Amino acid sequence: MGIIFDKLDQLWNTFRRESSILVLGLDNAGKTAILYTLQLGEAVLHTVPTIGFNVEEVIIGNVNIKIFDIGGQDSLRQLWPHYFESASGIAFVIDSADLDRIELARNELHALLSSKDLVGKPFLILLNKQDLPNAKRRDEMIDILQLKQCKSSKWHILECIATKNQQLTTGFRWLADHI
């Protein structure tokens, strides 16, 4: 019986696609917590600021996704373009409760959306920290981020909490389906 399951697993793996996703956003947006919550399937409550990048693999549906969580500090954002060519899609994380930095997040997102290396690649925009009282909601953020004018790439915006896997899986499934 074990042989049958091994053969079925091998067969399933032959149909599995592979892709690379960049998880980008400003520092302290929750990128690393999202990465590890997705990978482990449970809440990750404590992370440290990413200096450089983290890479993990996650299987969603029939797609084996290599996720690159790249630091969001100003000095590291300058390195993002080096990863664009190999990316199949982008997950852009925004701290929806950090009202002082939403404009900066919008500017960074628009720079990504207008990058010639990312044109046509799908963008998942994650509005993180929805559990905080002053978090901006989806409809308001679509206006604040001026997303309706972005026509160069397909995008999907989703409210989430980095420590709650269900919304994250839904979002990354959308991304996997549009790669």
Identify the residue ranges that each predicted region occupies:
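TRAFAC-class small GTPase G-domain
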Residues: M1-I179
